């Protein structure tokens, strides 16, 4: 017998009451969510499913689980027998199924109760349908929670809040043991979206007919903005489930048939983020009765669609940097990083930015700030979509998901008055006060472009962390999340050095595994996971004051550090606050679309020795491998790193007379750059090792791009926002200063 089953069937009558509510949900196109926590979970789920089948005889079903956990496959097989249209999805591969829409979603939460998975799968449920989450015990035996556990210690503040909110919300069936909590919702409170085709549309009627909401019709027509002459940016934002990617896909099919843009690129953090665009390009071309050719990858991904002289193809963000074309579409732009967007906008005349706001793939709030700044620099049109198409407006489960995962959390509106009260707030205090939690979490998600529901669980459940809050006028305006790391045993250090994960100690893990700094693991440290200030109060020194307070709190601690995705302005902030770069990842983190940097502020003599040695090695690595390992890194960032790291390496020696003569000849225009390339390399290496002159960051970055990274004048210009000629002028000016200083 499968664990969790109960052949007695005594619960059947408890749930034999929902049929009329399920029918009302079909009429109102809203969803139900069922949460079942019970030892006889299978019997309860089966009874609920039987009732649902009375309303929908042949539902499309998605089943989420970890197939390799004990008994999980057996449970899945039992459910599969009940349905004709059944798709089982491994949680780990669920990103591939973004955009799916089905009647019934069943989630096996016996071995995992992870916020990202719950948000993603519940979102696949369409109006009139139901999502079911079942578990024997939501608080124990969960994979993601184990990753937050250290020395057997972990909290359960996130789950308890989740369950408390579930009991209060209408439309949620909560069965805990034999206790049922359920308050019905009503179809009178919902409004289903409908298409609204303009009287004289410029985009073909066949494409408008494929739309499911007036918002989608609006996107089709207003996107024509991008086709007018000159540099233009089109921005499309919406919460999840509004059909923004579908709308852009239909619009691209129109552009292809008109052959307005011959070469269209689509990029996104992962291919699956933008697969709906390609699906709807195909639907659009089919509706227009246009023949096309598909180019697919070995695993079946549609990588390119070609018709006539036009093509749409997907490329990764890294490759998109060096591609050329007529139009580029960046899907899930909020999750891709503002530095990348700056680079794209520098090189492209026609750009479409599509992103989710209030989504589980990353907060769009930082992106919206970015868009507002763009409006003063470029001709920009911003289209907002409000109406959901997967379910009706007013859907109770969307409201619950927004609240339980704080997808729309906003910081309190208060201007800094010069007074800052800084306090250490416990996790328990935070999760007991929902207003405080929303304000604090709102600051975190507004200030950072990469956020997910998992972050909220980490905030509530991971022990060994401090939450420091800065208040002005009694309201939070800044937050710092700190976790204790280090103080490792010899066995733990050996395990990490042999490749075993220990993500609870991120900074020691990276420095032990990749830098082989074994004894660093014995030091006690604090890692600042996140520090954020509300948008209207940034640039006023508040973050720096919070850091100084954290340093004061760090009694008996050897170091305070941070790890983040390499970004020029962020790195400059940490350097300004006395932190030294000691590590830069050699491989790009594809999920975060960037390289990770570690900075450390030494608080003890022991840690200072490590900082000097590690930062010297980092400088040496940058000097030797920027042409290879860090070719795509922002040259300004490389220059900033090398200007703020130590130098233990030997000096380069005197500049040979022939080198001096060659550089002078280049500056005077008598020989081309390639003739003096090795000379320039010698001189810039000597400069960064000795740092005898304060060369401007612009000049240093130009030298880094051309000399150390080996970029062409054109690609160096793209990275720096300059013309090829301007880059060469800066290189000559920089070499002239270096020659005077070091020869």
Swiss-Prot record:
This protein is called what? tRNA(Met) cytidine acetyltransferase TmcA
Q: Where is the N-acetyltransferase domain?
A: 420-604
> Gene encoding this polypeptide?
tmcA
Q: Which UniProt keywords apply?
A: Acyltransferase, ATP-binding, Cytoplasm, Nucleotide-binding, RNA-binding, Transferase, tRNA processing, tRNA-binding
Say what the protein does: Catalyzes the formation of N(4)-acetylcytidine (ac(4)C) at the wobble position of tRNA(Met), by using acetyl-CoA as an acetyl donor and ATP (or GTP).
Phylogenetic classification of the source organism: Archaea, Thermoproteota, Thermoprotei, Sulfolobales, Sulfolobaceae
* Chain residues that bind acetyl-CoA: 531-533, 538-544
An example GO BP is:
tRNA acetylation
Reaction catalysed by this chain? Answer: cytidine(34) in elongator tRNA(Met) + acetyl-CoA + ATP + H2O = N(4)-acetylcytidine(34) in elongator tRNA(Met) + ADP + phosphate + CoA + H(+)
- Please list which residues make up the signal peptide: none
Where is the protein found, in the record's own terms? Cytoplasm
């Amino acid at each position: 017998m499968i664990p969790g089953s109960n052949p007695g069937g005594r619960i059947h009558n408890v749930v034999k009451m929902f049929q009329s509510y399920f029918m009302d949900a079909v009429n109102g196109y809203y969803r139900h969510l069922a949460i079942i926590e019970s030892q006889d979970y299978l019997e309860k789920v089966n009874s609920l499913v039987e009732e649902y089948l009375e309303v929908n005889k042949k539902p499309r079903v998605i089943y989420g689980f970890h197939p390799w956990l004990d008994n999980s496959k057996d449970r899945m097989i039992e459910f599969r027998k009940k349905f004709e249209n059944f798709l089982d999805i491994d949680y780990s591969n669920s990103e591939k199924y973004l955009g799916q829409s089905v009647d019934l979603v069943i989630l096996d939460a016996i071995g995992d109760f992870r916020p990202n998975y719950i948000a993603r799968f519940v979102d696949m449920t369409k109006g009139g349908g139901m999502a079911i989450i079942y578990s024997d015990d939501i608080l124990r035996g969960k994979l993601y929670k184990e990753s937050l556990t250290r020395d057997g210690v972990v909290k359960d503040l996130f789950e308890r809040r989740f369950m408390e909110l579930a009991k209060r919300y209408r439309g949620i069936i909560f069965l805990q043991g034999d206790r049922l909590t359920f308050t019905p919702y009503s179809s009178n409170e919902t409004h289903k979206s409908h298409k609204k085709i303009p009287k004289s549309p410029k985009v073909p009627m066949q494409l408008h007919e494929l739309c499911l909401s007036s918002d989608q019709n609006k996107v089709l027509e207003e996107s024509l903005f991008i086709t007018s002459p000159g540099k233009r940016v089109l921005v499309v934002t919406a919460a999840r489930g509004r059909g923004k990617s579908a709308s852009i896909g239909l619009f691209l099919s129109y552009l292809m048939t008109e052959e307005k843009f011959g070469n269209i690129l689509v990029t996104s953090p992962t291919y699956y983020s933008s697969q709906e665009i390609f699906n709807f390009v195909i639907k659009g071309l089919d509706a227009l009765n246009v023949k096309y050719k598909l180019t697919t990858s070995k695993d079946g991904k549609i990588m390119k669609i070609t018709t006539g002289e036009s093509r749409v193809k997907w490329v990764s963000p890294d490759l998109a940097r060096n591609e050329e074309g007529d139009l580029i579409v960046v899907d899930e732009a909020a999750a891709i990083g503002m530095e990348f967007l700056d680079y794209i906008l520098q090189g492209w005349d026609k750009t479409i930015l599509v992103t989710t706001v209030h989504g589980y793939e990353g907060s769009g709030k930082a992106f919206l700030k970015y868009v507002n700044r763009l409006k003063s620099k470029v001709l920009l049109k911003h289209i907002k979509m409000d109406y959901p198409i997967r379910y009706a407006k007013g859907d109770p489960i969307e409201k619950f998901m927004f609240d339980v995962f704080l997808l729309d959390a906003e910081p309190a509106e208060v201007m800094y008055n010069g007074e800052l009260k800084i306090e250490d707030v416990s996790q328990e205090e935070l999760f007991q006060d929902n207003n405080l939690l929303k304000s604090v979490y709102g600051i975190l998600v507004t200030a950072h472009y990469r956020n997910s529901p998992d972050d909220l669980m980490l905030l509530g459940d991971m022990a060994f962390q401090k939450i420091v809050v800065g208040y002005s006028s009694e309201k939070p305006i800044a937050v710092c999340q700190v976790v204790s790391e280090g103080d490792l045993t010899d066995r733990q250090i050996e395990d990490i050095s042999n490749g075993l994960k220990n993500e609870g100690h991120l900074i020691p893990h990276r420095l032990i595994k990749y830098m082989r700094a074994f004894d660093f693991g014995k030091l006690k440290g604090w890692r600042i996971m996140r520090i954020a200030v509300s948008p209207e109060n940034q640039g006023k020194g508040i973050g720096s004051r919070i850091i100084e307070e954290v340093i004061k709190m760090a009694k008996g601690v050897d170091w305070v550090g941070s790890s983040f995705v390499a970004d020029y302005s962020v790195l400059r902030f940490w350097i300004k606050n006395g932190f030294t770069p000691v590590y830069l990842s050699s491989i790009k983190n594809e999920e975060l679309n960037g390289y990770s940097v570690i900075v450390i502020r030494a608080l003890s003599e022991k840690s200072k020795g490590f900082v000097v040695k590690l930062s010297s090695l980092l400088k040496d690595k940058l000097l030797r491998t920027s042409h290879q390992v860090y070719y795509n890194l922002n040259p300004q960032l490389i220059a900033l790193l090398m200007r703020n790291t130590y130098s233990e390496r030997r000096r380069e020696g005197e500049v040979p007379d022939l080198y001096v003569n060659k550089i002078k000849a280049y500056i005077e225009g008598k020989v081309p750059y390639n003739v003096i390339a090795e000379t320039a390399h010698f001189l810039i290496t000597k400069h960064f090792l000795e740092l005898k002159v304060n060369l401007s960051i612009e000049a240093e970055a130009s030298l880094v791009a051309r000399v150390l990274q080996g970029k062409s004048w054109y690609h160096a210009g793209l990275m720096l926002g300059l013309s090829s000629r301007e880059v060469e002028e800066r290189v000559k000016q920089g070499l002239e200063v270096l020659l005077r200083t070091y020869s």
